[in-house]
């Protein structure tokens, strides 16, 4: 089934020069980039995006990090795009769960700065795309 998913290349991925390689991996996976935007997220957008974590002790740090510098927000489309992107991204915790050869396995050093984000379900994708690309 053709799906769309939100992707974020977080500030650490932009700062460390991984944007080109990440986009290349997306295209090699057969996924299509339908939107791509370099921007610095504002607090309101970040807080909406991470609302499910608002009661967690790391929420403030997460919002501070994602708004600290430019990131790339995008929409990727393709067959089972959500699962395909999550497979490319690798596990959330780069040391314990991200396999070498995945984006996080190759580029991330900590769970807090783990290079990329991707929606985890069709419902999350719809919600997150609406937050980052409200005019679509």
Swiss-Prot record:
The gene is ndk. Major role in the synthesis of nucleoside triphosphates other than ATP. The ATP gamma phosphate is transferred to the NDP beta phosphate via a ping-pong mechanism, using a phosphorylated active-site intermediate. HAMAP family: NDP_kinase. The lineage of its organism: Bacteria, Bacillati, Actinomycetota, Actinomycetes, Mycobacteriales. The active site is at residue 117. ATP binds at residues 10, 58, 86, 92, 104, 114. GO terms for biological process: CTP biosynthetic process; GTP biosynthetic process; UTP biosynthetic process. Its cofactor is Mg(2+). InterPro entries: NDK-like_dom, NDK-like_dom_sf, Nucleoside_diP_kinase, Nucleoside_diP_kinase_AS. This is Nucleoside diphosphate kinase. It is found in: Cytoplasm. Homotetramer. PANTHER family: NUCLEOSIDE DIPHOSPHATE KINASE. It comes from Corynebacterium jeikeium (strain K411). Keywords: ATP-binding, Cytoplasm, Kinase, Magnesium, Metal-binding, Nucleotide metabolism, Nucleotide-binding, Phosphoprotein, Transferase. Its EC number is 2.7.4.6. One of its GO terms (cellular component) is cytoplasm.
